[in-house]
Amino acid sequence: MALPRFCSYCAAPLPAPPPVTCRACDTSHWLDAKPCAGALVARGSQLMLVRRAHEPWRGAWDVPGGFCGPREHPKDAAEREVREETGLSVRVGSVLGMWIDTYSDQGKDADKVTLNIYFHATVGTGAQTTIDPNEVAEIGWFEADELPCDLAFPGHIPAVLRAWREGLEAAPRPAARAARPASTRKPEPSL
């Protein structure tokens, strides 16, 4: 990642890499992580993944998601990204976890440090997908034990999927209902 060498306000040389304060104008410079949000959209025991249609990681499978807009809550960003990429409206639930990674624009820009926040999400029955070909080449639904290996962002997506799978394994199973004993009470008379 190329670090800034000059102040973005007054163009004076910076005395050190960020975080640093410019000696000439007192402007602070930081390399903050860019917030990103994604949704692990489940349908029963299956997870939806999208095959990326653009770089970086064109052709690799990914969790639907992307950068948060200015002042956009990560939950809202996750819902928006799923809708933009797949046409689905989802209900975002609890946080699965957070991971730090980098996002490379293939030489167009310095790599960005990203803070990636992932949420559990569900989609209503009968919902139809609509692919945005600029973003997504394909949508796939995968069982937890059949997730693909060709994954985007290997610095964190494998860990995200592992956490999702471990959550499924740890989830309490519905208990079988015990048969109720027959009531010995007489029914109330009807009025």
Spans of model-derived segments:
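Acidic, metal-coordinating catalytic segment for phosphate/diphosphate chemistry
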Residues: 1-38
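Nudix hydrolase/Nudix homology domain
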Residues: 1-3, 126-191
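Conserved N-terminal beta-strand and adjoining loop/helix that marks the start
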Residues: 24-48, 67, 120
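Conserved Nudix-box catalytic region and its N-terminal flanking loop in Nudix hydrolases
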Residues: 42-84
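Active-site-adjacent beta-strand/loop module that shapes the phosphate/pyrophosphate-binding cleft
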Residues: 99-128
